[in-house]
Amino acid sequence: MSKLLSGQVALVTGGAAGIGRATAQAFAAAGVKVVVADLDSAGGEGTVEAIRQAGGEAVFIRCDVTRDAEVKALVEGCAAAYGRLDYAFNNAGIEIEQGKLADGNEAEFDAIMAVNVKGVWLCMKHQIPLMLAQGGGAIVNTASVAGLGAAPKMSIYAASKHAVIGLTKSAAIEYAKKGIRVNAVCPAVIDTDMFRRAYEADPRKAEFAAAMHPLGRVGRVEEIAAAVLYLCS
């Protein structure tokens, strides 16, 4: 796969940690030049440093994906840094602990939808024209198993991930004939810092999460990264 991707340019949002960091590192290991984007400057720069220490090439651009001007500047920054954009992994997202639907509040709804839905829409809105101008590209959006079904106390998050899948399908249909492939990955529970913080206080929750999966364990960030690179190849 590295021969297929080598020399190309990838943008990874939410690249400061977790799935985003692992995917940025996987792209770099395959010879791809990587633009890492995140609100967390320290984490994003840490990802870039790890890539460079491993012999890869990367730059960091701070970006709030909920703001149109910042996303526009991010994509322009990709073109300025490397001249093109071949792959985009729109991974930035949040999950706020929720109660039942009727107990939710407007602030939670707005925050989740702004990052998880508007953020993905804005990223594709600005990535697609650049890809069209260069003759094609590949986009992968991070959805979730929550976007394929439902679970208690996750109504807003589930709605946001259903929306990501809808955006992905629509973009895929609209731009396939123009050489742009658009797909989504739908992770279940993944072993990230966020997961560990959520379950460290109650090991029983971690055991329950592992038992939900046919493999008997939660997923690994490297497994999602491999799926993203496959979809880009």
What are these regions (language model features)?
Residues 124, 160, 168:
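Active-site helix of classical SDR
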Residues 129, 173-177:
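Alpha-helical segment proximal to the catalytic Tyr-Lys
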Residues 144:
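Residue(s) in the substrate-gating loop at a strand-loop-helix junction
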Residues 184, 204-233:
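C-terminal helical subdomain
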